[in-house]
Amino acid sequence: MPFTTLQVFSSYSLLKSTIRLNEYVATGKLLGYKQLALTDDGVLHGAVEFYERCIQNGIQPILGCTFEVAWKSDASKKEMLVVYAKGAKGYESLLKLSTLYQQGLTWTSEMTEWIGSHSEDVKIVLPPMDSEWVAAHSKGRLEAVLGAVKEEYDGIEIAVGITREMVERGEFDTMREGIEAAGVIPVAFSVSHYLNTTDYFPWKVLQAIRLGETLSFTQEDATGSESLPEATSMTKVFQTAVDGVLLSNLEQFTKDLVVEIPLRDTMLPKFPVPGGKTSAQFLYELCEAAMLDMGVTTPVYVNRLKEELAVIHEMGFDDYFLIVWDIMRHAREKGIQTGAGRGSAAGSLVAYLLHITGVDPIRYHLLFERFLNRERYTMPDIDLDFPDDKREDILAYIVSKYGNQNVAQIVTFGTLGAKQVIRDVCKVFGENIITVQKFSNNIAQGKVTLEQTYKENKTFTGEAGGNNSYKNSSSEKVETSKKHTSMDNNSSDSTEKKPENNDETSKVESDNTESDKETKEQETEETESRVNKPDNNELEIIPSN
């Protein structure tokens, strides 16, 4: 009966966790975990990365999400839920819930209704921290409150989390009868916002950055209790506590939280081909007609076309090329300027004949194999360039033709670079602008890390030592933390209480030096969840997985 930490936040819960997924999975494996859970705050940004890393390390991934939702019966009552996926349908339900949550339906009954209508696909845990059900226990209303929650989510398996501390204080003994009377399952529980106990203070610094608050370091801040515990030691604790019931309940609760994400499947919408033809037939006809119109009918073109179409069909991308052709056709019909094409797609004769690109690959000796290759299965990557003010028109056309469910845009994550993290950490400790500039100006411009700076810049190393060592360690720990998301030219800031000029792309204070101002304007570092972010005037065509 191995222990599993049921609530874990990663850096994808923007500025709420110091846990990076690569470190989480590696540490979890070292600590003896057979299962690892990811339950970020309302988002599933890290789900695919987490899933892949777990599978590669022989660990069962448990996918969940943390939501604060209102009750259907009383919207003034809110409860923190961790919702877990059971199978593929459960994962799809989590995606839908995450969408509702991010659309601002955090505290409405719509989420409650959606969860209730998918009772076979999900499970729920009520964490004990700051919860109404734990508060109700002290008022003698535990059974009534849990019974009401059970009624809200009728048909769903619901558990309450019982921590090691609750067992050791004897708290669970006093509430066990009420929990079981309400028909709710008590399970062994812990929560992690950081990996190691010594990461507690850097995590507090991260929260201060998010909330725009200041801190001072005390020795009590050296370690914390919400780290990732060792699986073996927690198993022993809960095996001996209350007849091992919490651990056995945990095992039963998690055994069917199994999800398989079809990572390598091609999920393209079908292009509406006219006249009852197949996509391959229609694609061939378009290319053949274009060859005649363009006067490129010599054997070298004919043979190249046959070869490319064979590869495209064999790899299942006939519809992909028709979709992109149709988008470009629509743009030209509406008088929207299009680019001539760039990157490896310029090596495709099919793309040239469909006017997706404007470069003849045979004339310029460009290789199709660099774009698509039987020996290396990858999706085609075609970048389409449109004017900034026409992007929404193009997107609206795509949505109208294929539906919202088949169209997606790519999120990017602004991260804390070396200069910005030093600024933010100094502000957290109430340093004046001169001190902030002194630290910041000793860091080279560009994508340089704090570790590099410590090694290469003795002046900075001297400034960062001594009484500033805790700032140094905190800065290193929160460096590269994801700070905000953006899509196209819009940004969604992660701050709950947004401090003035906190974001790395915002304007700096008026008394900053000119060089510091230039650096700050340049510093936003972007990382992507799956593919490169398009330029502002570029639309990248990818399948919506």
PLM ranges: what are they?
Residues M1-N467, K471-S473, D535-N545:
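Alpha-helical scaffold/interaction cores of sigma-54-like transcription cofactors
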Residues G446, Y454, G462, G466-S544:
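Mature, Sec-exported extracytoplasmic domains of Gram-positive
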